[in-house]
Amino acid sequence: MTLSKEVVLEALRCCRDVYPHTEDFLVSRKVAGHTILAVEGTNETTDWITNLKFLIKRDDCHRGFKNNANRTLAQLVVAYEGLNPERKLVIAGHSLGGATATLIADLLWESGNKNIALVTAGSPRPGGRRLRRRIKDLCHLRFVHGDDIVPGTPPWLAGYVHTHPVVKLKDENDTRFDGVADHNIGSYYDAAVKYYESKKVAL
């Protein structure tokens, strides 16, 4: 399964635009045949990295991320009375929203909904190896921009892993280590536009 440039950039745009949104998520149907669900994350790294509790307790997933996934999915069902199964659902998220999006995808995938895909930007590791095995066949574009430090958390020594290979986005202003600045979702979106301009093809 592949995702077009149009779908991926719309997903990342929604990840950017969800921050000032009143809800914890943003839904877009601008791309024909697709529904894009963007989950709110955070642009602030220092507050939550220092306080993050590195616990895998339920279904091999970080408990906090899993709670966010359950809450967001419940809100979505109430707000939209379900989703059109004929449209591909692309779940997207930046930062903590990326981890939440991954676990929403896990919930839907395990329930038998295979008409989904995942786009994440600067996501921390969401869980352990059992989670990775469960969704290994899910289409997931996992973007990391420059020196972004968030994808390196929680530590792999605590049993945390990423579920899919990385797609690296170049930092055009990479004159120093700027792992916090590189986490900004606006920088992710701009770098993705340049990435696709250089590729001229869909992933």
What kind of region is each of these model predictions?
Residues M1-A92, L96-L203:
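Non-catalytic, mobile gating and regulatory segments of ester bond hydrolases
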